[in-house]
Every structure is written in C-alpha cells, then in structure tokens.
C-alpha cells in the first residue's frame, strides 16, 4: 500500500514523504541579550504556553538576569527536554513575543510544513513513544534536540497537512467545549446535593 496513512481524505493521493523531525524543524536559540522586558512563560503538559504568573503565583523576577532567557515568537515551538515524554511541548500562539527559561529546547517548522499539523504530529502517541526510546538518562529521560531530530516520520503535501490540522483542531475545540459543559454540570450537581440532601446544622 506504500507510505500512506490508514485513514485519509479522498481528494488526496500519493505517498507521504519519509523524513526525520530534523528535516522538518529548525533548532534555534535566540537569547535575550538586550535584556528586553518581555512576559515570562512556561510550557506545561496540558495547557501549552502559559504565563509563569499563572503557574508560580509568588514568582518575583525583580533583579533577575534575563539575558540568558530565550525569546519566542508566534508559531515558534518549545519543549522541556526532561518532560517532553509527558506532553511538555507546545506551539506559541501569542501575537507578541515572550521569553522562556534557557532550559527549554526551541525550534521552528521548515518551509512546506504547517505549524498546526506539526503540533498534532508531535503530540501523537507514536511520536511520543519515540521520545522515550530516543531519550537519554536513567530515572528521568532527557531528550535534547540532536536526538529529537533523529526521530523518523513522514509528511504529506501542505494542502493535506492543513486539511488534517483543521479537522483535529476542530475536534480539540469540541472536546474543550464539552469538558466545560461537564464541569458546569458537576458544579450544578454539587449544589443540588447540598440543597436536596444536606440538612441544616446548628
């Protein structure tokens, strides 16, 4: 059958091109040498890029040397080499640049690669499996860019990439909406339990 996926949109044909992640990404290290005051972000397992103030409420950067931090722009990627195997990899969607810890690995998509498609690829179970296989270390696995770049995969035309990305992004949005509805229903149920079952005390 060739190098094609099991499930495919009918308008596309032809084999996907074999490659490595190093063929479709470009590693970069843009340091904040000018000490530009930018918002500080972290890469989380489930929420992607978030302001550090949301993750560490008491974080105070006054007097901290920020020239070693890395600058990230819209559509750039970053991951935590010690936690990529549990989902700590994301694409930055902010309209203005931010800065992140120097510990993160940063990269961009090459020409001909859709960033949204790439993000779905990098979070796919098969690719995540290879994060562990290609990582180094004992109890904690570290995956730095040279080993990340060796992971083998395949990619279709840019048109097919975008079609796939649009579908998967739509499904993600529906799941997010449904989860919010579930959370509201759970809150409602708790309120009903208090009103219907719990007796007044005192």
Regions found by a protein language model. Give the residues of each.
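A short glycine-rich beta-alpha junction/loop motif
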Residues: 2-6, 82, 98-103, 136-159
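Extracellular/lumenal glycan-associated surfaces
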Residues: 162-174
